[in-house]
Regions:
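Bacterial N-terminal signal peptides
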Residues: 10-20
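Absolute protein N-terminus
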Residues: 1, 26-27
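Small-residue-enriched, tightly packed secondary-structure blocks
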Residues: 27-226
Length: 226
């Protein structure tokens, strides 16, 4: 076999090995979370029991989506998950983000038999949104929270900073988020935007963007105008 053929053969083997270790276009963990958030938001938006969420989305300052909040094992001795936050610009009405967060609680209140839930939170006040721009927020203390009404005849008199909705295996309201710590995930924000950024940079200054967020932004924007 000629030297040239050997070189081509060696190059092909190298490419094959590198492809196995570093798959082309493999999504990062933050990108995967955004994709899961798209599916979670779609699930809630299409659920006939989520009429309150749909009708009040246009009044929300921001939306937090946690595709998977687990009962145990995420943190030692506790429960939690990861979430994305998208906010609406007060002047243009455009949605920006996401910023990435970690949700954790030593004793998240899961209903019996539930191991994990998907969660959507509507941030209804400026206080609620500003609290999320800080390093850490304790739901129920730094911002008031209530479980969102479920069903077509859902009540309308909710005035808390945050309204949460959760679903698990067809069960609604499967997790109580009161007392939960919501912390900025600086590492995932840096990975998604390829530089160190804060939620203020992402959601207020709009100084960074990532095309992988466009679909989720569009989903929420379209849901608001329906």
């Amino acid at each position: 076999m000629s030297k040239r053929i050997w070189q081509l053969f060696a190059s092909a083997i190298t490419v094959a090995l590198l492809s196995a270790v570093y798959p082309a276009f493999a999504a990062s963990e933050p990108e995967q979370l955004v994709t899961k958030a798209e599916e979670t938001f779609k699930n809630f938006q299409n659920d006939p029991q989520m009429s309150w969420l749909r009708s009040h989305l246009n009044a929300a300052k921001a939306v937090m989506i946690a595709p998977e909040v687990r009962k145990a094992g995420f943190v030692v001795g506790g429960s939690g998950g990861r979430a994305v936050l998208l906010a609406r610009d007060k002047e243009t009405g455009n949605w920006s983000g996401p910023a990435f967060y970690t949700i954790a609680n030593a004793s998240l209140g899961f209903q019996a038999g539930i191991e994990k839930s998907e969660v959507v939170m509507l941030i209804m006040t400026e206080k609620g949104l500003n609290s999320l721009l800080n390093d850490q927020l304790k739901l129920g203390a730094d911002a008031s929270i209530a479980a969102g009404p479920v069903g077509t005849g859902a009540e309308k008199g909710i005035t808390t900073d945050v309204v949460s909705f959760s679903r698990s295996k067809g069960i609604y309201g499967g997790v109580n988020l009161d007392g939960t710590l919501v912390t900025i995930n600086d590492g995932w924000n840096a990975r998604f935007y390829a530089k160190a950024v804060t939620p203020v940079d992402i959601l207020v200054r709009h100084s960074v963007t990532n095309y992988n967020a466009q679909k989720l932004q569009d989903q929420i924007a379209q849901a608001v105008i329906k």
